[in-house]
């Protein structure tokens, strides 16, 4: 356990030399300003504005995750060709430390994006139909359903490089947006990049502050969707650990 906390401390020190922290801070603030400015003059209902904002937030997740994982992996490559990760007696602790820091940054950034928007929507525009607790719950739901993507993009960044991770993230965001339409009604549970957007949409419509019974299609897919998300996340975490123990610090193109 002491080794794990030392790894966490080391990862936090590394943040001072890379733009990861600024990405997690400035991107949410920019999104809040843009959407609050836009919503100040649009005639849509307050509930639809919140729903659209959270969906855009969910759709942008894969791209942002791809970028921050690429930055983290690139920093390790520049600092001795991943030796800081590979030379520890227990590699998995080093991997867990890096992944934990990325997840904590993602959680903090998402809370800032969601709750910050809620504060502005509630107190500046006086339009929010929900309390701040709703936005905090939404942030936790978004991050929880995106754990799979963090593990996937960390693997892609280490194995194939930053270009592959960022490119995959952009593609996943496009697919996620597409699966918010009727095309994804019965297919989203099999596509990890669609989980966050679909879960937050279902929660907005039928849960949280609008607790009503789900229609048959949504009800029959919600439980399999949760099961797919949980099992898929656990599986990729295990596979990432197994691969990392055998990895020698080389990319596939080398």
Descriptions of predicted regions:
Residues 21, 31-64, 69-70, 99-162, ...:
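Secretory targeting signals
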Residues 65-69, 78, 149-153, 192, ...:
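Hydrophobic/aromatic residues in alpha-helical transmembrane segments
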Residues 1-2, 72-83, 149-177:
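Cytoplasmic juxtamembrane interface segments
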Residues 166, 172-251:
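Terminal transmembrane helical anchor/hairpin motif
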Residues 27-31, 101, 169-176:
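Transmembrane alpha-helical core residues of multi-pass small-molecule transporters
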Residues 70-104:
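Helix-loop-helix units of permease transmembrane domains in multi-pass membrane transporters
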Residues 1-25, 249-253:
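Aromatic- and glycine-rich beta-strand/loop motifs that create alpha-glucan
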């Amino acid at each position: 356990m002491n080794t794990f906390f030392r790894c966490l401390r080391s990862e936090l020190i590394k943040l001072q030399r890379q733009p990861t922290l600024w990405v997690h801070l400035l991107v949410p603030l920019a999104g809040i300003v843009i959407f609050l400015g836009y919503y100040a003059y649009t005639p849509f209902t307050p509930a639809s504005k919140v729903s659209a904002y959270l969906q855009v937030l969910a759709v942008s997740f894969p791209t942002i995750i791809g970028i921050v994982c690429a930055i983290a992996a690139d920093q390790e490559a520049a600092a001795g060709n991943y030796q800081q990760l590979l030379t520890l007696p227990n590699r998995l602790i080093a991997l867990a430390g890096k992944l934990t820091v990325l997840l904590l940054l993602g959680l903090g950034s998402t809370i800032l994006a969601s709750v910050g928007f809620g504060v502005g929507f509630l107190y500046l525009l006086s339009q929010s139909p929900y309390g701040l607790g709703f936005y905090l719950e939404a942030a936790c739901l978004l991050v929880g359903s995106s754990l799979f993507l963090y593990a996937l993009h960390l693997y892609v960044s280490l194995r194939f490089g930053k270009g592959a991770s960022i490119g995959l993230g952009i593609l996943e965001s496009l697919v996620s947006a597409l699966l918010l339409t009727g095309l994804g009604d019965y297919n989203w549970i099999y596509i990890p990049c669609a989980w966050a957007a679909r879960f937050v949409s279902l929660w907005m419509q039928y849960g949280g502050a609008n607790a009503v019974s789900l229609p048959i299609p949504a009800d029959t897919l919600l439980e399999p969707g949760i099961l797919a998300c949980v099992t898929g996340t656990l599986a990729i975490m295990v596979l990432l650990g197994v691969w990392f123990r055998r990895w020698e610090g080389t990319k596939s193109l080398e």
